[in-house]
C-alpha cells in the first residue's frame, strides 16, 4: 500500500502536461490549476509558492521542473510564458515569453532551461539572462511537445511529441542550422534553429510523453507510448537502434529508473490506471501497485531513490516505497526524511492511505 495519500483538488487530467516534480533538496512541487504548492519532506510543511492567475485571470500552470540545485523551480504556463522561482525566498527571479502556446514540459541542463510547447518548438534558455534568453531552438516536431529529458552526461536531449515522434538531439552535432529571425525581443539575434535531430525515431504509434535515461548505461533511453501504442521501448541513442519493445497493454504516462539501473517503474492510464515495476533488462514485471481510479499521469522520484510519488485525475497524490534505498547520484541528498509518516498535505489532504489503495504482486 502507499505510505501516504494526499488530496490534490483540481489537478488537471491532461496527458500532455507535467505537473509534479521532486527536488534534490527533498521538496515536492505540485501544480493545481493556477497555483503551485511545495511540500518539504524534512519539515513536513506545505506552502503555496505562487498563484499565476494574479498576473492574468486566465493563467494556469502547465508544467513544473526543479533545477539540479534544488533551489529553483521552472514553471510553464498555458500562455506560453515560463517563470523561474527562487523557492527558498518565495520570489520569481525570471520570466520568459517566447512560446506562442502552452508550455507542457520543462527540463534543466545546468543553467539552461529547455521548454517544449504546443507551438511545436523547443527553446533552450539561459536562465541567468534578463533578456534575449533563447540560446537555440529545436524545431522538428509536427505537433505538441510533451516529453523532454536531457541525458545524464548532458549531451543528448530526448524529445517526445503528440506526433508520435521520438527525437534525439545532440548539442555537439549541428547539421542544417539556420538563423532565427529576430522578430521577438526575447530571442537573441545570434540564436540558431536546428531542424534536423540526430535521430528521428518513428516506431511509436501514439504520443510519446514518458522518457527516462538509464542512470548507469550511457546512451540507453526508455520511452513509452500512448493509448494506441502502449509500449515501453529501449533505445541505443548512439546508433538510433531500438534495443527492445514491451507491450504493457495500457497507455504509458511516465517512466523512471532505480538508481542502480536494474529496475524501472512505469505509470499507466487507459485502461489499467496502475503502476508497474519492471526488472531490467528482462523487462519482467515484479510488482503492480493499484489504488488510483483514473490515469496515473504524473510521477516524481525521491532523491534517495526509494520512494515515488504519483498523481492522477482522481485528485490524489500517492507515495510508494518501491526501490531499495541508495545514497543517490553524486550531489544528491541521502535518505528521505522519516517525517513522511507525518505528512502535512495540501488543502483537504487525507490523514492516511485511502481505503481503495492496494498492492499486488505481478
Label each PLM-derived region with a short phrase.
Residues 36-40, 82-86, 106, 122-126, ...:
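WD40-repeat beta-propellers
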Residues 1-19, 26, 318, 362:
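Acidic and/or Ser/Thr-rich intrinsically disordered tails and linkers
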Residues 9-14, 53-61, 97-103, 138-145, ...:
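WD40/WD-repeat beta-propeller blade N-cap
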Residues 16, 60, 69, 102, ...:
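WD40/WD-repeat beta-propeller blade-loop signature
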Residues 31-33, 76-79, 116-119, 159-163, ...:
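Conserved strand-to-loop turn within each blade of WD40 beta-propeller repeats
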Residues 19-25, 64-70, 76, 106-112, ...:
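Loop/turn segments within WD40 beta-propeller blades
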Residues 1, 249-251, 271-273, 282-362:
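Terminal intrinsically disordered, low-complexity extensions flanking WD-repeat/beta-propeller proteins
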Residues 4-9, 45-54, 91-96, 133-138, ...:
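A short beta-strand motif characteristic of beta-propeller blades
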Amino acid at each position: 500500500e502507499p505510505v501516504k495519500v494526499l488530496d490534490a483538488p483540481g489537478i488537471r487530467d491532461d496527458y500532455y502536461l507535467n505537473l509534479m516534480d521532486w527536488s534534490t533538496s527533498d521538496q515536492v512541487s505540485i501544480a493545481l490549476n493556477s497555483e503551485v504548492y511545495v511540500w518539504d519532506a524534512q519539515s513536513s510543511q506545505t506552502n503555496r509558492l505562487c498563484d499565476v492567475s494574479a498576473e492574468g485571470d486566465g493563467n494556469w500552470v502547465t508544467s513544473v521542473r526543479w533545477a539540479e540545485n534544488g533551489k529553483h523551480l521552472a514553471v510553464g504556463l498555458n500562455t506560453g510564458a515560463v517563470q523561474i522561482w527562487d523557492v527558498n525566498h518565495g520570489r520569481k527571479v525570471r520570466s520568459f515569453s517566447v512560446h506562442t502556446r502552452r508550455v507542457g514540459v520543462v527540463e534543466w541542463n545546468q543553467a539552461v532551461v529547455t521548454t517544449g510547447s504546443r507551438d511545436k518548438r523547443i527553446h533552450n534558455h539561459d536562465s541567468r539572462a534578463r533578456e534575449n534568453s533563447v540560446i537555440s531552438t529545436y524545431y522538428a516536431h509536427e505537433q505538441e511537445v510533451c516529453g523532454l529529458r536531457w541525458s545524464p552526461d548532458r549531451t543528448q536531449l530526448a524529445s517526445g511529441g503528440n506526433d508520435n515522434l521520438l527525437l534525439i538531439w545532440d548539442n555537439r552535432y549541428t547539421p542544417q542550422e539556420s538563423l532565427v529571425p529576430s522578430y521577438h525581443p526575447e530571442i537573441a539575434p545570434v540564436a540558431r534553429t536546428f531542424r534536423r535531430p540526430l535521430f528521428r525515431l518513428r516506431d511509436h504509434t501514439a504520443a510519446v510523453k514518458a522518457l527516462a535515461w538509464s542512470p548507469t548505461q550511457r546512451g540507453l533511453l526508455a520511452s513509452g507510448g500512448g493509448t494506441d501504442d502502449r509500449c515501453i521501448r529501449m533505445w541505443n541513442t548512439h546508433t538510433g537502434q531500438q534495443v527492445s519493445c514491451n507491450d504493457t497493454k495500457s497507455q504509458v504516462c511516465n517512466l523512471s529508473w532505480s538508481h542502480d539501473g536494474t529496475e524501472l517503474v512505469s505509470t499507466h492510464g487507459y485502461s489499467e490506471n496502475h503502476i508497474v515495476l519492471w526488472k531490467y533488462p528482462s523487462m519482467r514485471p515484479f510488482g503492480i501497485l493499484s489504488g488510483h481510479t483514473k490515469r496515473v499521469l504524473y510521477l516524481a522520484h525521491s532523491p534517495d531513490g526509494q520512494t515515488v510519488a504519483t498523481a492522477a485525475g482522481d485528485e490524489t497524490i500517492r507515495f510508494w516505497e518501491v526501490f531499495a534505498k541508495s545514497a543517490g547520484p553524486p550531489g544528491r541528498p541521502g535518505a528521505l526524511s522519516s517525517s513522511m509518516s507525518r505528512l502535512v498535505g495540501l488543502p483537504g489532504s487525507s490523514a492516511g492511505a485511502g481505503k481503495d489503495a492496494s498492492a499486488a504482486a505481478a
